[in-house]
Amino acid sequence: MKTLKLSLLSLIALTFLGFKADETPLEKLLKQLAKITATYPQEKVHIHLDKPYYTVGEDIWLKAYLVTAEKNEPSLLSTVLYVDLIDNKNSIKKKITLSVDKGIASGNISLLDSLSSGMYRIRAYTNYMRNYNQDLFFEKFIAIGSVADNKIAKKVEDKKVEFGIQFFPEGGNLIGGIRSKVGFKAVTADGLGANLSGYIVNKNKEKVAEFTAEHAGMGIFAILPQSNEQYTAIVTLADNSIKSFKLPAVLESGHALAVNSTAENLSIRISSTADLVQGKDVFVVAQVNGIVYASFTSKVDKAILTANIAKKVFPTGIVQVSLFDANSKPIAERLVFVNHNDQLKIDVTNTTEAVTKKKANLALN
């Protein structure tokens, strides 16, 4: 009987190993992604403040809502929330920790008299959120002023606007010979969007593209980068000050990922340099909040590959489209917002006439 048990266990093991061997590379990749999501769950936090601006010496009263990225449900993963008050020099001026109970936390930040007036940033995160990029931390800019004294105010001389700008090539990289869209975001030292315009030049100072910030310091332009070139952005601000910034280096070899949103589909376009057109597999995975909703394998047997994914397979939200090479290494990524206009429509009716400050009854429909 003992021998029979060993034989059965061996058979189960062999069957399991056989199943593993029959897995496609894409199936293995999806299992790896699922394991990462389970091992390092994502959380999101949103904070409500009691008002939009403050004075030195006051308290910032806040309430935080911590949810799972996967289902937007109250998170039970973290019991501590970290909240930082950061000045416009990126220096942390105050740090507090809040106890989280069933996804809810509340508290206050005392604004010491030693604080200078200006724009500050509220940043909130949990230990789990540290497993991912800090771009996923909650951030909000607030204005903090100081009480004016009775002294005669001195005339403040005009200062040049200090700002920074970041460039985001579509898919992550500029690749020689492949036309690409490049997004940009420009912010002032106060964290506000910078109103600017400019153009792109190559190393011979030849103009190859122009751009203008369209909203909150953000915009987009198209460029056909060439290998062995270095591109520079010449930027002009509203005060006519001019600065130059280097664009990311151009790669000689690589795959570029472009995703366009049409009425019904996400249109996927994979462009490859000639040296990579060898018939090897690449994998495309589309997920929302860590859940994979679509995936496929394609062979790079030509310079441009296209495919469509129906938008109806995704819930409303940000779709992360990732491109992996034959070794399951991520090589490009795009984020696209899918909106099915299925948000809750709530009408609020005040059932009592508000004459003075008092408790009021609201009807939600």
What spans do the regions from the language model cover?
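Bacterial Sec-dependent N-terminal signal peptides
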Residues: M1-L30, L364
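A structural signal for beta-strand and strand-to-loop patches characteristic of beta-rich domains
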Residues: T24-N365
